[in-house]
């Protein structure tokens, strides 16, 4: 079995590389239909998804036409030999700069995978409207396989806690942010 997402894919903005070995080309600006503000109550797998495609049901929230920059990110020539992807076309939301959709092309420039990133935007203390959660579906067209993943698929349907949203009991930096503190927790 396995997953349709590789380490290079598993980043919520659609790109997990560095500018030292990658370059990119701007392709276009487009309005795209996306789910940017949603209710994670619908994110229960598989009931909250339109199967077998793994798309969110309407109960997740309202789809909106949002401004996107479309860019082609690829390795620089000296680093491209032997790399699995020749091109990564990212459809990035112009407000939050997250890749909401990524098309990945194999070394022969054939479409291999498409990955949807449903990046939820919410009120983040000190930042305002920013990314605060993600769900994803990766379709591997060459191997007829799909991986559906949701960060809200927990029994409490919680998004990550950020900054002052973190409950007081978890704001102990020594207990939760040091080896000695983690050793106390693991006892």
Residue ranges and their predicted role:
Residues 1-15, 62-164:
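Gly/Pro-enriched, hydrophobic low-complexity segments
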Residues 1-67, 78, 170-187:
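Flexible, processing/modification-adjacent segments and terminal tails
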């Amino acid at each position: 079995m396995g997953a349709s997402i590789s380490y290079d894919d598993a980043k919520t903005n659609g790109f997990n590389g560095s500018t030292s070995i990658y370059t990119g080309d701007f392709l276009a600006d487009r309005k795209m239909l996306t789910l940017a503000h949603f209710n994670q109550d619908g994110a229960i797998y598989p009931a909250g998804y339109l199967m077998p495609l793994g798309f969110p049901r309407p109960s997740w929230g309202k789809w909106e036409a949002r401004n996107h920059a479309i860019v082609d990110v690829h390795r620089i020539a000296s680093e491209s030999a032997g790399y699995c992807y020749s091109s990564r076309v990212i459809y990035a939301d112009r407000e939050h700069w997250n890749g909401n959709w990524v098309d990945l092309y194999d070394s022969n420039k054939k479409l291999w995978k498409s990955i949807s990133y449903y990046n939820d935007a919410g009120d983040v203390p000190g930042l305002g409207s920013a990314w605060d959660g993600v769900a994803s579906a990766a379709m591997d067209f060459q191997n007829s396989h799909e991986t559906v993943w949701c960060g809200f698929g927990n029994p409490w349907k919680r998004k990550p806690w950020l900054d002052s949203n973190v409950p007081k009991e978890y704001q102990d930096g020594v207990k939760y942010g040091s080896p000695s503190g983690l050793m106390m927790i693991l006892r």
